[in-house]
Amino acid sequence: MWQFTVVSLGWLAVFLSLSGAKGNSCPASWISRNGVCNKLFPDRKTWLEAEMYCRALKPGGHLASLHKDSDSTVLAWYISDHFKGAGHVWIGLRDTNKKRSWKWSDRTSTNYFSWNQGEPNNVQDNENCVHLWAPSGYLKWNDEPCASLHPFICQYKL
C-alpha cells in the first residue's frame, strides 16, 4: 500500500511541475522581497493611475509598500541595476486626508519612513504622494504632487 502512496505522490509532483505550479515564487520578470513580488513599470503615470494599474494587474496588487531598510535597499538595487535613468519612482504612500497622515495603499502599517532631508515639505500645500527620490539612489523618499507623472513599482503578496 505504501508503494501506491509513494507512486501517487510522485505522479502528483510531476503533474504539478508540468502544469507550471511554482508555489511561493514570483514570475520571471518580478523580484521577490519579504513575501511579496515587485515589478517596476517604466510607463509614466499619475500616482492614482499607477495604483489603479497595479490593482488591475494582479489580485491584491498595489503600489509597493516599504517597512524596513532592507525593503528600501532591495528596491533601490533593482531600480538602479535594471532601469537606468528611470527618474523618480512612485511607491504606495500618500496623505489621503491632506493632514500629513501618511498611509500605504495596501493598508499595511505605516511603521517605517525614509524621508530625504527636509522632507516631507508639502510645497504649495500640494504634495500628498510619495516617490523614491532618484538622486538618493532610490533610498530616500520625497513628497510630490499626485498628478506628477513617474514610473512606478507594483507589488502583490505571494
Curated annotation (Swiss-Prot):
Subcellular location: Secreted
Tissue-level expression: Expressed by the venom gland.
Motif (Mannose-binding): 119-121
Cysteine disulfide partners in this protein: C26-C37, C54-C154, C129-C146
InterPro entries, alphabetized: C-type_lectin-like, C-type_lectin-like/link_sf, C-type_lectin/snaclec_domain, C-type_lectin_CS, CTDL_fold
UniProt-annotated binding residues for Ca(2+): E127, N142, D143
A GO MF label: toxin activity
Signal peptide range: 1-23
Keyword Disulfide bond: yes
Domain of life: Eukaryota
Gene3D superfamilies on file: Mannose-Binding Protein A, subunit A
Occurrences of domain C-type lectin (ranges): 33-155
Alphabetic keyword roster: Calcium, Disulfide bond, Lectin, Metal-binding, Secreted, Signal, Toxin
Function summary: Mannose-binding lectin which recognizes specific carbohydrate structures and agglutinates a variety of animal cells by binding to cell-surface glycoproteins and glycolipids. May be a calcium-dependent lectin.
Family: Belongs to the true venom lectin family.
Name under which the protein is recorded: C-type lectin
Natural source organism: Cerberus rynchops
